[in-house]
UniProtKB/Swiss-Prot annotation:
One of its GO terms (biological process) is ATP synthesis coupled electron transport. InterPro entries: CcO_II (IPR045187), CcO_II-like_C (IPR002429), CcO_II_C (IPR034210), Copper_CuA (IPR001505), Cupredoxin (IPR008972), Cyt_c_oxidase_su2 (IPR014222), Cyt_c_oxidase_su2_TM_dom (IPR011759), Cyt_c_oxidase_su2_TM_sf (IPR036257). This is Cytochrome c oxidase subunit 2. Changing residue 123 to V: In strain: Isolate MSB 53282/NK 7980. The gene is MT-CO2. Its EC number is 7.1.1.9. It is a multi-pass membrane protein. Belongs to the cytochrome c oxidase subunit 2 family. Component of the cytochrome c oxidase (complex IV, CIV), a multisubunit enzyme composed of 14 subunits. The complex is composed of a catalytic core of 3 subunits MT-CO1, MT-CO2 and MT-CO3, encoded in the mitochondrial DNA, and 11 supernumerary subunits COX4I, COX5A, COX5B, COX6A, COX6B, COX6C, COX7A, COX7B, COX7C, COX8 and NDUFA4, which are encoded in the nuclear genome.
Length: 227
């Protein structure tokens, strides 16, 4: 989860988020190198009064600054497209959960079970127990099995919402009348927090998301107790 004064991303808990972190580092290094080169050239031009007349109209330089940016864009586009295809790929999910956004709470339905659904509201600050997180705790957590592919079907009953869990690399819009899907896989158990990431009204800040990833045996026990 996020911490105060955090400068980087949350720790990755899914293969997709790990790929996104690597891609971020890759593109950031390219931006750093380009910025350093531009600043060096600017400082060189400002600190010298000499002008190289042959560079004012040189075919070689024009060729270089046409081909080099094209190569850089390809180096950015290829890993980006690879990650996009990975995020869209859903092969034989072990579990499907339908998520509906409301003003201002989430409702969940486990479609593989006959009658397993619930609403998830934020716990008010006055009702929190010691150690619980303000504006992030909910009355009903979404319990899911770890290390298994899970399909999330996401939509909305009223206005635009966005279902987002940063540590899992998830952010999917909840649009009325449209069903979007996302793949979720966690490599380790734990509690993972998110929030609605689309301004949806006066209580937009009070729509937390809490996923509890547990071993498969614990999930089976939980689902049996909920039915």
């Amino acid at each position: 989860m996020a911490y105060p004064f955090e400068l980087g991303f949350q720790d990755a808990t899914s293969p997709i988020m790990e790929e996104l972190l690597h891609f971020h580092d890759h593109t950031l290094m390219i931006v750093f190198l380009i910025s350093s080169l531009v600043l060096y050239i600017i400082s060189l031009m400002l600190t010298t009064k000499l002008t190289h007349t042959s560079t004012m109209d040189a075919q070689e330089i024009e060729t270089i600054w046409t081909i080099l940016p094209a190569i850089i864009l390809i180096l950015i586009a290829l890993p980006s497209l690879r990650i996009l295809y990975m995020m869209d790929e859903i092969n034989d999910p072990s579990l499907t959960v339908k998520t509906m956004g409301h003003q201002w709470y989430w409702s969940y339905e486990y479609t593989d079970y006959e009658d397993l659904n619930f609403d998830s509201y934020m716990i008010p600050t006055s009702d929190l127990n010691p150690g619980e997180l303000r504006l992030l705790e909910v009355d009903n957590r979404v319990v899911l099995p770890m290390e298994l592919p899970i399909r999330m079907l996401i939509s909305s009953e009223d206005v635009l919402h966005s279902w987002a869990v940063p540590s899992l690399g998830l952010k999917t819009d909840a649009i009325p009348g449209r069903l979007n899907q996302a793949t979720l896989t966690s490599t380790r158990p734990g509690l993972y927090y998110g929030q609605c990431s689309e301004i949806c009204g006066s209580n937009h800040s009070f729509m937390p998301i809490v996923l509890e990833l547990v071993p498969l045996k614990h999930f089976e026990n939980w689902s049996s107790s909920m039915l």
